[in-house]
């Protein structure tokens, strides 16, 4: 699933491609991608101009004229690409926004898990899943105190806690494994047993790794591509994720992999301490 750095990369690459364009027509080849009223989606978007593209956590917020916003969640494999309106359709293209200049933005999703909603701008927290999210890394609200206090109430393991979007918005499996290895915290550590000073270190590393990943335009492990069809660059910097059986760069112990609530989790059994 695209995590915060990947969605931010999509946002940054989409802006120069579609900002300022006016929608002429919308085609829904797979209507279930749109979670709100399909007919309204088709009838209200023609004539609307792309004003800007924002993001919160893993959600893209495509700002339109007349105070409307398309909220888009890519889920597992959603992608956007710009083409011409007469270009052959790929079998995994499910939504098309045709612009007045003859170009078209297509949403492609192999698994069909992605979702879009058409809402009034400013109602994101009231009408979408954004309202259930915690603060995202590198925001002014995501302080070390916020994370320390948040973990005090969590008795589950730290891996699941960091994947909980109501605690930290935007993190996924890849970056959680990397952060826990950097901070030498075992993924099965009980969240509220981790010392405050260690949680502060965790906070700093979350911010750091997200910054690094955004700078390198995200991580492509399976299928992630930005809006220009390019892969990310952070996969070459991964130290633990995808390296099961290889030696830890710090101690030489072979990385091990376990399942934590169904999620593959790679860690160093020597460096990473279990807090219980």
UniProtKB/Swiss-Prot annotation:
Catalytic machinery residues: 2 (schiff-base intermediate with dna), 3 (proton donor), 58 (proton donor), 263 (proton donor)
E.C. number(s) listed in UniProt: 3.2.2.23, 4.2.99.18
Catalytic activity as recorded in UniProt: Hydrolysis of DNA containing ring-opened 7-methylguanine residues, releasing 2,6-diamino-4-hydroxy-5-(N-methyl)formamidopyrimidine; 2'-deoxyribonucleotide-(2'-deoxyribose 5'-phosphate)-2'-deoxyribonucleotide-DNA = a 3'-end 2'-deoxyribonucleotide-(2,3-dehydro-2,3-deoxyribose 5'-phosphate)-DNA + a 5'-end 5'-phospho-2'-deoxyribonucleoside-DNA + H(+)
Binding residue positions for DNA: 92, 111, 154
Record protein name field: Formamidopyrimidine-DNA glycosylase
Zinc finger (FPG-type): 239-273
UniProt GO BP: base-excision repair
Family annotation (CDD domains): EcFpg-like_N
Listed GO MF terms: 8-oxo-7,8-dihydroguanine DNA N-glycosylase activity; class I DNA-(apurinic or apyrimidinic site) endonuclease activity; damaged DNA binding; zinc ion binding
Subunit structure of this chain's protein: Monomer.
InterPro entries reported in the protein's UniProt record: DNA_glyclase/AP_lyase_DNA-bd (IPR015886), Formamido-pyr_DNA_Glyclase (IPR020629), FPG_cat (IPR012319), MutM-like_N-ter (IPR035937), Ribosomal_uS13-like_H2TH (IPR010979), Znf_DNA_glyclase/AP_lyase (IPR000214), Znf_FPG/IleRS (IPR010663)
SUPFAM superfamilies documented for this protein: Glucocorticoid receptor-like (DNA-binding domain), N-terminal domain of MutM-like DNA repair proteins, S13-like H2TH domain
Assigned keywords, A-Z: DNA damage, DNA repair, DNA-binding, Glycosidase, Hydrolase, Lyase, Metal-binding, Multifunctional enzyme, Zinc, Zinc-finger
Annotated gene: mutM
């Amino acid at each position: 699933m695209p995590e915060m750095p990947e969605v931010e990369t999509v946002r940054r690459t989409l802006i120069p491609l579609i900002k300022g364009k006016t929608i002429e027509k919308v085609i829904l080849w797979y209507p279930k991608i749109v979670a709100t009223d399909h007919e309204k989606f088709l009838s209200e978007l023609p004539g609307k101009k792309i004003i800007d593209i924002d993001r919160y956590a893993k959600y893209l917020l495509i700002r339109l004229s007349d105070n409307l916003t398309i909220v888009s969640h890519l889920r597992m494999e959603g992608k956007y690409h710009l083409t011409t309106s007469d270009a052959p359709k790929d079998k995994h293209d499910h939504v098309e926004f045709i612009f007045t200049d003859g170009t078209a933005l297509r949403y492609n999703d192999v698994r069909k898990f992605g979702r879009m909603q058409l809402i009034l701008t400013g109602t994101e927290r009231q009408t979408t899943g954004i309202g259930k999210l915690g603060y995202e890394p590198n925001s002014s609200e995501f302080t070390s105190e916020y994370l320390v206090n948040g973990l005090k109430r969590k008795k589950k393991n730290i891996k699941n806690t960091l994947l909980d979007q109501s605690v930290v918005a935007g993190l996924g499996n890849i970056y959680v494994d990397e952060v826990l290895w950097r901070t030498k915290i075992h993924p099965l550590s009980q969240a509220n047993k981790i010392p405050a000073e260690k949680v502060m270190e965790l906070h700093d590393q979350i911010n750091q790794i997200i910054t690094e990943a955004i700078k390198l335009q995200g991580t492509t492990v399976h299928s992630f591509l930005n809006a220009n069809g390019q892969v990310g660059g952070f996969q070459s910097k991964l130290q633990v994720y995808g390296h099961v059986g290889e030696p830890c760069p710090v101690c030489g112990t072979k990385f091990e992999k376990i399942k934590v609530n169904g999620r593959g989790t790679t860690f160093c059994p020597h460096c990473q301490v279990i807090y219980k």
